[in-house]
Amino acid sequence: HRTVLSAIRKRSVAGKIEITVDGLVGDDQGDKTNHGGIDQAVYLYSSEDYFWWSGQLNYVLPPASFGENLTLSSFGKNPVRVGDRFRIGEVLLEATGPRIPCSKLATTMGDPEFVVRFEKAARPGVYTRVLKPGFLQKGEIVEQIFGSMDAPTVPEVMRLYGAKKPAPEELRQALRAPLAVRTRTRLEHKLAIINQGTD
């Protein structure tokens, strides 16, 4: 699948942007406890999902409303799975899971119920780790390289993350994928609780 990188977070950028294993150079996270890290180094969102949200909210959201580092034109017809990769110029990214919404997103949107809306919408964007650093710029072609079809989709991981009684086999299958550490820890904890109840 091929799509187009359409914008870069926060401001219009002329020229090339450097991406390292820590993310975009010059683009830091304010809350490093819950955001960022090498397996959540670059957060992708799509213009297609922005268009959907504009229809739901009846107004046009400004760029980077969801805190993404890079905005793609589309994620394509098939949901992104954990382990799928994105080649953007010389940069190679690997999907590690969804953005888990928090109160900061609700504050940004001016809607105390927006976290619930975001979860129900199942359009969480995609956290990625940087497998190959390099430079990119607006307008680059994006090539999606599909990973294992056994891996969970990113929306499925978000559902498992918030589920009160997730199916243990779904958790086990998700944990076989290259998840971000914070998400992996949460799902491992859920599975441990289930296993304790069956001992």
PLM-predicted stretches and their roles:
Residues 74-76, 122, 132:
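Short loop/turn positions at the edges of beta-strands in beta-sheet-rich folds
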Residues 1-106, 113-114, 146-199:
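Electropositive, beta-rich accessory/interaction domains or terminal extensions
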Residues 112-130:
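A mid-sequence, solvent-exposed acidic-amphipathic segment
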Residues 26-29, 128, 137:
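Short, flexible micro-motifs
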Residues 143:
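Acidic, Mg2+-coordinating catalytic module of metal-dependent nucleases/exonucleases
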